[in-house]
């Protein structure tokens, strides 16, 4: 028995603690919430009686106490005409990948509601500026943006809604919105394109029998000076139209639209795409002036050009939507890539001409013949001795004790002495030398030694001769490639500009 009492007491204490905690939590939530405004039609008679009779609040209560926001003005009568105008605060750049743009606007709607005519005893101004909390108490058009992707209201620091009620029953509502709107792009002329982006305002539930949207006369869309990073937008290029739509089963729904014409600025793409790719193509032509034998210089130059252009194509493709048609920029990049690839193909043709088997065999035979001719010339030079000399030289010998110098010495002192007495005593195997007996070089202006030195000098090896056909290909390429690229530029810019 005592055990059951203890359990019951424990359960009772737990319930009390839980109830106290829930009350504390709800009170904290209530403090954080803003007090909700009740429309006059929802307030009790006692609450309405507390309002002073001559106050503006009392006049509003008298207007709205029997007001039903669920019923449109002129119910079962003529449709309500809603005059619309827009003030554009900011205009975001168009995103090519998602095909949309973002705007920040003041949307203003004005209509007449006979139920909201101010009483004759109202002595204030012709319009009442009403707190946005009363906006929910009024009937309002069910406007939405037909091509909207996302949108949001602004409530910093207060809810950005402005409400006016005029003496004759006109109601003006202005609200600040940020909207992302779809804009289907035609990128055929990209980046020299002009885009037309729409903003469509449509009724969601009311047909044309109940509601009609009308653009305000004058300038329904007010646009201040707005600078976009890639586009130019001007007030003169804004168009207005009617886009009333028919939906099967429900009928016609009112719709108005504004069309913004945006012209793309080409400067960014000129500096970032066209100029670099043009220079890369011109760089690939430098290989035509490099010796065909210099493969280490020509091949990397061509490969660098092709890879750079291919990388540029890949980078731009990632930044643009995947469309099924060819854009103007694609035509340019493909043409530049073909010119770079053609320079590589041209060098391949030159290499085929250089490595032709018949040409290689003929070159080997020519080099061998040249080497044989050089060998014969060296033997003739070695036979040029004193007795075979055509020009007389002054020679002398040096004798130390009983040993004679092992070579004939020619010196400047001998040339001055004009001594020919020892010529007959020289053995036949002695040869002239350009060195004296002490191994020092001497200069002989008209003697046999200088002639023999020239003849004994080994000639350089024969250089391979580049075929005329290979040279002709490079020569033609130097003129043909720039001419073709210039012709392509004339056609390209005349079409797309």
UniProtKB/Swiss-Prot annotation:
Gene3D superfamilies: Neurotransmitter-gated ion-channel ligand-binding domain, Neurotransmitter-gated ion-channel transmembrane domain. It is a multi-pass membrane protein. It is found in: Postsynaptic cell membrane; Synapse; Cell projection, Dendrite; Cell membrane. Glycans are attached at residues 54, 242. Glycine 1 binds at residues 108, 174. It catalyses: chloride(in) = chloride(out). Residues 290-294, 350-472 are cytoplasmic. GO terms for molecular function: extracellularly glycine-gated chloride channel activity; extracellularly glycine-gated ion channel activity; glycine binding; transmembrane signaling receptor activity; transmitter-gated monoatomic ion channel activity involved in regulation of postsynaptic membrane potential. The modification Phosphothreonine is found at residue 391. The record marks 307 as: Important for obstruction of the ion pore in the closed conformation. GO terms for biological process: acrosome reaction; adult walking behavior; chemical synaptic transmission; chloride transmembrane transport; gamma-aminobutyric acid receptor clustering; monoatomic ion transport; nervous system development; neuropeptide signaling pathway. Disulfide bonds join 183-197, 243-255. Glycine 2 binds at residue 250. CDD domains: LGIC_ECD_GlyR_beta, LGIC_TM_GlyR_beta. PROSITE patterns: NEUROTR_ION_CHANNEL. The keyword Coiled coil does not apply. Pfam families: Neur_chan_LBD (PF02931), Neur_chan_memb (PF02932). The chain crosses the membrane at residues 269-289, 295-315, 328-349, 473-496. Residues 23-268, 316-327, 497 are extracellular. NCBIfam families: LIC. Forms heteropentamers with glycin receptor alpha subunits. Heteropentamers with GLRA1 can be composed of two GLRA1 and three GLRB subunits, or three GLRA1 and two GLRB subunits, or four GLRA1 subunits and one GLRB subunit. Forms heteropentamers with GLRA2. Functional GLRB-GLRA2 heteropentamers contain four GLRA2 subunits and one GLRB subunit, although alternative subunit composition cannot be excluded. Forms a heteropentamer with GLRA3. Interacts with GPHN. PANTHER family: NEUROTRANSMITTER GATED ION CHANNEL. Belongs to the ligand-gated ion channel (TC 1.A.9) family. Glycine receptor (TC 1.A.9.3) subfamily. GLRB sub-subfamily. This is Glycine receptor subunit beta.
């Amino acid at each position: 028995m005592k055990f059951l009492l203890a359990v019951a007491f424990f359960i009772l204490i737990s319930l009390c603690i839980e109830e106290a905690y829930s009350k504390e939590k709800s009170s904290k939530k209530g403090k954080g919430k803003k007090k909700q405004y009740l429309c006059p039609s929802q307030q009790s008679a006692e609450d309405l009686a507390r309002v002073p009779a001559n106050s503006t609040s009392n006049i509003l209560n008298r207007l709205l106490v029997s007001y039903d926001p669920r019923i449109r003005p002129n119910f079962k009568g003529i449709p309500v005409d809603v005059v619309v105008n827009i003030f554009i605060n900011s205009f975001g750049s168009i995103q090519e990948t998602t095909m949309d743009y973002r705007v920040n606007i003041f949307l203003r709607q004005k209509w007449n509601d006979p139920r909201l005519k101010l009483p004759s005893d109202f002595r204030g101004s012709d319009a009442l500026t009403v707190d946005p909390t009363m906006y929910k108490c009024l009937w309002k058009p069910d406007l939405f943006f037909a091509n909207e992707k996302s949108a949001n209201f602004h409530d910093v620091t207060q809810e950005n809604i402005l409400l006016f009620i005029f003496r004759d029953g006109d109601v003006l509502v202005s609200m600040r919105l940020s909207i992302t709107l779809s804009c289907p792009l035609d990128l055929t002329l990209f980046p020299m394109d002009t885009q037309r982006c729409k903003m469509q305002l449509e009724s969601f539930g009311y047909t044309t029998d109940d509601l009609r949207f009308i653009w305000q006369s004058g300038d329904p869309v007010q646009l201040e000076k707005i600078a976009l990073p890639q586009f130019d937008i001007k007030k003169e290029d804004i168009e207005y139209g009617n886009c009333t739509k028919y939906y099967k089963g429900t009928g016609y729904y009112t719709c108005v639209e504004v069309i913004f014409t945006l012209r793309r600025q080409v400067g960014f793409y000129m500096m970032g795409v066209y100029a670099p790719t043009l220079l890369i193509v011109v760089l690939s032509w430098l290989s035509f002036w490099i010796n065909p034998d210099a493969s280490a210089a020509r091949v990397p130059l061509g490969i660098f050009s092709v890879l750079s252009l291919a990388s540029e194509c890949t980078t731009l493709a990632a930044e643009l939507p995947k469309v099924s048609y060819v854009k103007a920029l694609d035509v340019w990049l493909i043409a530049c890539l073909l010119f770079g690839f053609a320079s590589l193909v041209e060098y391949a043709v030159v290499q085929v001409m250089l490595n032709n088997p018949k040409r290689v065999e003929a070159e080997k035979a020519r080099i061998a013949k040249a080497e044989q001719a050089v060998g014969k010339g060296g033997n003739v030079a070695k036979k040029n001795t004193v007795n075979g000399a055509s020009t007389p030289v002054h020679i002398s010998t040096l004798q130390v004790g009983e040993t004679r110098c092992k070579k004939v010495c020619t010196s400047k002192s001998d040339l001055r002495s004009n001594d020919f007495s020892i010529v007959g005593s020289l053995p036949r195997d002695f040869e002239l030398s350009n060195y004296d007996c002490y191994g020092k070089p001497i200069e002989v202006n008209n003697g046999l030694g200088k002639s023999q030195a020239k003849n004994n000098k080994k000639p350089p090896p024969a250089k391979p001769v580049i075929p005329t056909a290979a040279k002709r290909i490079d020569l033609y390429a130097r003129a043909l490639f720039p001419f073709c690229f210039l012709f392509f530029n004339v056609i390209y810019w005349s079409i797309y500009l």
